[in-house]
């Protein structure tokens, strides 16, 4: 009974990819990979399984969302929950050997356990880049500009990139709150976009009216470069002001790249990825309720693999990007050759000739078809090779 119950079911959060969606993903993946390589990034693959003690611990994904298992030697393994930590491992151990910038890219599935009521995929495809070894703001601008270029190449119409700086938020919170516990509470509200909860908590704490106003004013710091000077008035520390200055430099470089019109500053932007140390960003499309991609600077991550190096990068969610793109043309050019046994050799020869021309061709024996009318609707055209002498038809 239990076997029948689960016969057509999938584990929680797992999804099938049917032919139409697979073809659409392939097209999107292809144009993005081509653009990434044009920018000089090299693709890399890492194992699906990693050690929990290394990549699992270095990942910013919460422990309860990791898929864990034991190997035969008793080591705890995890299905990779993101690609940044595995690439940091590879770079630290094998590739980042001379201290010069390293540009890597990836296209892979990642795995994150979901709650039953969450309704989100536990396995999803990401495509992205990591720029390792360059600590300049220009490097941050490069990966943001590349991300914008990728989205334009896919045909995505309207999207916006929100950019912030975790160093600014942390500096402001430390100045006013004085401890990490309170700061983490407010960061969680900001990540969840729960601004009502944020305001209520700020007002419930015994803070001066000036400090309350500073924390509340943070929520209004969104827009163009004019918010940078406003942001600097809320902080007194050098760290906070330096973070704001980095955003000013970033916007200037993005204007040089010609992508500044797609970018808006959001000084209250934070991420659930705890390894971000500086500039961070998210990209949104009107048709999707969640970010379709995110990224930022993570200068401390490679140190966990005993190879300190600055780094920045981003990842795009292919499933959400497909949803944002919406209706699009997918290749529907498969031809079919239906043949009887007497015409097998002729059918094979014709199929091979068409395939050599780059066409997609199905070769189908007439005896294997139950409903010829329904079957013929699947293909752009059908060639019939039937009977001993036969008669060709379209």
From Swiss-Prot:
Keywords: Amino-acid biosynthesis, Cytoplasm, Histidine biosynthesis
Record-annotated membrane-spanning stretches: none
Pathway: Amino-acid biosynthesis; L-histidine biosynthesis; L-histidine from 5-phospho-alpha-D-ribose 1-diphosphate: step 1/9
Top-level lineage group: Bacteria
A GO term from the CC aspect: cytoplasm
Higher taxonomy: Bacteria, Bacillati, Bacillota, Bacilli, Bacillales
NCBIfam families xref list: hisZ_biosyn_reg (TIGR00443), PRK12292.2-4 (NF008941)
Record's keyword annotation contains Cytoplasm: yes
Protein task: Required for the first step of histidine biosynthesis. May allow the feedback regulation of ATP phosphoribosyltransferase activity by histidine.
A GO biological process held by the record: histidyl-tRNA aminoacylation
Disulfide bonds: none
Subcellular location per the Swiss-Prot or TrEMBL entry: Cytoplasm
Signal peptide: none
Main subcellular location of this protein, as a coarse class: cytoplasm
Name the UniProt record assigns to this protein: ATP phosphoribosyltransferase regulatory subunit
Assembly: Heteromultimer composed of HisG and HisZ subunits.
Listed InterPro entries: aa-tRNA-synth_II, aa-tRNA-synth_II/BPL/LPL, HisRS-like_core, HisRS/HisZ, HisZ, HisZ-C
Gene coding for it: hisZ
One annotated GO molecular function: transferase activity
Record family assignment: Belongs to the class-II aminoacyl-tRNA synthetase family. HisZ subfamily.
Keyword field contains Cytoplasm: yes
A Pfam family: HisZ-like
Family matches, as PROSITE patterns: AA_TRNA_LIGASE_II (PS50862)
Gene3D superfamilies the UniProt entry points to: 3.40.50.12590, Bira Bifunctional Protein, Domain 2 (3.30.930.10)
Misc remark: This function is generally fulfilled by the C-terminal part of HisG, which is missing in some bacteria such as this one.
